């Protein structure tokens, strides 16, 4: 549809005002540079979509927004452009939709009329998006029976656990750590690989995570290129190292059951298997305890420099093995 008459000034005004619909104060670093880059890209996309009918205008502007990295500082709520393009791209997919968008290295949340869309990833593999329905009730619900997208209802008053068959599961998700040093506790240079794995500066607190170390088989060891599946890592040695990729994550339960990798050593640093809780013990595996923002405990595979840290006494999160 070509803009004629009053549509041209309205669309031009929309392109100018769209980057300023911010949910919070913008960062002062290179703010005008990114806005000018977005306007240049958006005007080019508008002219291209006006002359050719190959792509829709909403997809072009969405691509310009992500390409100029305005999502790092701006959260556009209930935008018809993002709502339309992302819902069309995410909801019909049964797995994970990947779009060829570079330079987006952090999960972003887009609030639409039907729920919340989380996008994460970046680099050569592209960006992945998921639609998650948020509910304010305290009860735990199962997945959406439609099966188009693995939709889970998250209970906000409770700790961040996804629901599967009415039972909560611990939330372990991995994202790349690149340009967000403020998420890591500056008092611990090893980033949680020491005796006490506590992360006080993780934002937001209800979405803490831990990953398993890097590998050539994917972005991180133990996590394949698809964020919804867990794969067995290639064991290069007898220990696993906890990498430095921590950050907020969407509450998505992997399709496969939680898998705990085995190590040849019985327990690191003299820890014995009888000191472990039954939920964390599988054969000769020693697990370390990581606390998320709410203080509830979760178990990760044993690391070479990791000691056993007992979980809080009052822990409301149930772990399914």
Swiss-Prot record:
Instruction: Output a single Gene Ontology CC term carried by this record.
Output: extracellular region
Which Cys residues form disulphide pairs? none
Q: Which residues form the signal peptide?
A: 1-23
Segments for region (Disordered): 210-237
Q: Which residues are glycosylated?
A: 114
Q: Which UniProt keywords apply?
A: Glycoprotein, Secreted, Signal, Virulence
- Where does the protein end up? Secreted; Host cell
Q: What is known of its domains?
A: Has the canonical translocation RxLR motif, but lacks the canonical EER motif, which characterizes most oomycete effectors identified so far.
- What does this gene product do? Secreted effector that partially suppresses the host cell death induced by cell death-inducing proteins.
Annotated protein name in UniProt: Secreted RxLR effector protein 71
Q: Species lineage, top-down?
A: Eukaryota, Sar, Stramenopiles, Oomycota, Peronosporales
Q: Which gene encodes it?
A: RXLR71
